[in-house]
């Protein structure tokens, strides 16, 4: 099983818990080449579609950016999993998400708060990188950080700036400006790339060892009228 599939399997319970009853209409922003949660949502009776420039081919998937996707009708739910920190214009994407939702519709966000990825958390993660098998993004960061000769914080901020990433706290502020917050919490994030480290293992280290939870879970509803 790939790290991506381990991630989707681990986060499906959270997404499923906040979906309204089927057959609600659901759109996933940034479903990726695997289709994100769309297959699982369809299995559970939801009318789910995925939007991503690298979405799978086939019915229900749209190979385009969400900002350019034309909806035929509003949806009941939008799911965004580790996609918002990558978008070019966060405000534009969230404005379109609010427009795409029915009044009272649900927004489910699974994100990464990269600003919480401090050196202690990085070292804990790098110490647990698998020696064989799939080499993922954490392997690359470990190698690039060592090669840079920079302090970790300088390396991380430089990389995030070059990639144009949005901070988790900035994502939350932008969400709160347009939606009614129902839930906001941090969670383990790195375990899928550290197999056989489990989510419980990472949570235990967060609780006992002082590493930081960099995952971000956020659930909100679209108000009947614009906020502010």
Feature-to-residue mapping (PLM):
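Conserved class I S-adenosyl-L-methionine
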Residues: 23-32, 108-140
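Class I SAM-dependent methyltransferase SAM/SAH-binding core
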Residues: 32-68
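A conserved beta-strand element that flanks and buttresses the S-adenosyl-L-methionine
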Residues: 79
């Amino acid at each position: 099983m790939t790290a991506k599939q381990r991630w989707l399997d681990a986060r499906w319970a959270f997404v499923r818990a906040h979906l309204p009853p089927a057959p609600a209409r659901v759109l996933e922003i940034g479903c990726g080449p695997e289709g994100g949660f769309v297959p699982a949502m369809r299995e559970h009776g939801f009318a789910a579609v995925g939007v991503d420039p690298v979405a799978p081919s086939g019915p229900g998937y749209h190979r385009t950016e969400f900002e350019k996707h034309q909806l035929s009708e509003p949806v009941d739910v939008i799911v965004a999993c580790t996609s918002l920190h990558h978008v070019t214009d966060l405000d534009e994407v969230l404005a379109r998400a609010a427009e795409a939702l029915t009044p009272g519709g649900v927004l489910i966000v699974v994100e990464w708060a990269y600003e919480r990825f401090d050196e202690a958390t990085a070292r804990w993660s790098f110490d647990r990188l698998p020696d064989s098998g799939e080499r993922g993004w954490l392997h690359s960061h470990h190698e690039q950080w060592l090669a840079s000769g920079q302090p970790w914080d300088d390396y991380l901020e430089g990389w995030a700036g070059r990639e144009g990433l949005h901070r988790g706290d900035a994502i939350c502020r932008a969400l709160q400006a347009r939606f009614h917050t129902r839930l906001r919490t941090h969670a383990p994030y790195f375990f899928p790339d550290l197999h056989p480290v489990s989510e419980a293992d990472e949570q235990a280290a967060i609780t006992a060892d002082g590493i930081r939870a960099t995952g971000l879970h956020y659930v909100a509803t679209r108000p009947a009228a614009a906020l502010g």
